[in-house]
Swiss-Prot record:
MF annotations from Gene Ontology: anthranilate phosphoribosyltransferase activity; magnesium ion binding
Binding-site residues, 5-phospho-alpha-D-ribose 1-diphosphate: 80, 83-84, 88, 90-93, 108-116, 120
EC annotation from Swiss-Prot or TrEMBL: 2.4.2.18
Protein name: Anthranilate phosphoribosyltransferase
Listed pathway(s): Amino-acid biosynthesis; L-tryptophan biosynthesis; L-tryptophan from chorismate: step 2/5
Organism: Desulforamulus reducens (strain ATCC BAA-1160 / DSM 100696 / MI-1) (Desulfotomaculum reducens)
Length: 345
């Protein structure tokens, strides 16, 4: 199938969802050569990936992921595509602790740095979290703490076949956008930031196709994959298989304008310090950015009806120490799990 798929895509012909599923299956079962994988990814990039293609790829990837089992329901994920090149601090990771502090179960899917200086796994490690949990440990962490980090390389083993071609061609590929669509705990609700305004409605429709419960796809001012205080954000709400476009301006909710430079991050040590400060109640544009992005997650998880209520609740969760407490609990429990491993040896 992959040979036929390459020929079609090179000719500018879109794949059907079924064809995309079959093609990805060959890739993830090691039946495609590295040259074929590289050719397919490059051709797709040049043609532009469609909703049926991304949906089909994601469906196959979901069948290959090592599933994280949990007793928790109504899971939320804040994993975005990354790749905006802005080198901000880890906004979606900080938001995850606000959501968990509010009582939402958070299955935070992520990886090490791809396009920035510091990925979610990097900053969580710096904060003291043990990120390389087994599927069983991650499920236990979700059950006991209400938040767990799902480290992509340990749970998407079939991705190994595409790793070398992706690295060698050195361009952004469809795999960069498949990560947020393939949460190993099958989170039903998402806040998914994207690096391109053109990609936002595409991924919103893909989420609808995949049966998301309630999710938001965000493309922020200045190309950010988050809502920023610099200006209006393009947001797509996905609910009941319907996609609704909206524009969100933080100023409409009493938040002051701030340049994107106010969100500048650095290495893992710097970003960890910034997150700790925000969760400890430090005021400023970094806090306000976390609050408005977390507010969307609170809506997605069903805790609040609208953005204004979400902002108020996010402020309360931070100011009353619940978000920081959740971070500390995750650090403690993840390290306890490591200790159990050592004791079992």
């Amino acid at each position: 199938m992959i040979t036929e798929a390459i020929q079609k895509v090179v000719a500018g012909i879109n794949l059907s969802e079924a064809e995309a599923m079959e093609t990805m299956q060959e890739v993830m079962e090691g039946k495609a050569t590295q040259a074929q994988i590289a050719s397919l990814l490059t051709a797709l990039h040049l043609k532009g990936e469609t909703v049926p293609e991304i949906t089909g790829f994601a469906r196959t990837m979901r069948t290959k992921v090592i599933r994280v089992q949990t007793k928790r329901r109504n899971l939320v994920d804040t994993c975005g595509t990354g790749g905006d090149g802005a080198n901000t601090f880890n906004i979606s990771t900080a938001c995850a602790f606000v959501l968990a502090g509010a009582g939402l179960p958070v299955a935070k899917h992520g990886n090490r740095s791809v396009s920035s200086k510091c990925g979610s796994a990097d900053v969580l490690e710096q904060l003291g979290v043990f990120v390389q949990l087994t599927p069983e440990e991650a499920g236990l962490c979700l059950d006991q703490v209400g938040i767990a980090f799902l480290f992509a390389p340990l749970l998407h083993g079939a991705m190994k076949y595409a790793a070398a071609p992706r690295k060698e061609i050195g361009i952004r590929t469809v795999f960069n956008i498949l990560g947020p669509l393939t949460n190993p705990a099958f989170a039903e609700n998402q806040v998914l930031g994207v690096y391109s305004s053109d990609l936002a409605p595409v991924l919103a429709q893909v989420l609808a196709n995949l049966g998301t419960k309630r999710s938001f796809v965000i493309h922020g001012c200045g190309g950010l994959d988050e809502i920023s205080l610099a200006g209006e954000a393009l947001v797509y709400e996905v609910k009941d298989n319907q996609v609704k476009e909206m524009i969100i301006d933080p100023m409409d909710y009493g938040l002051d304008r701030a340049p994107i430079s106010a969100l500048a991050g650095g290495d893992a040590k710097r970003n960890a310090r910034m997150i700790k400060n925000i969760l400890s109640g430090a005021p400023g544009p970094q806090r306000d950015t976390i609050i408005i992005n977390a507010a969307l997650g609170l809506i997605a998880g069903g805790l609040v009806r609208d953005l204004a209520m979400g902002i108020r609740l996010a402020e309360q969760i931070i100011d009353e120490g619940y978000a920081l407490k959740k971070l500390n609990l995750l650090v403690e429990f993840s390290q306890t799990l490591v200790g159990r491993r050592s004791a079992a040896l």
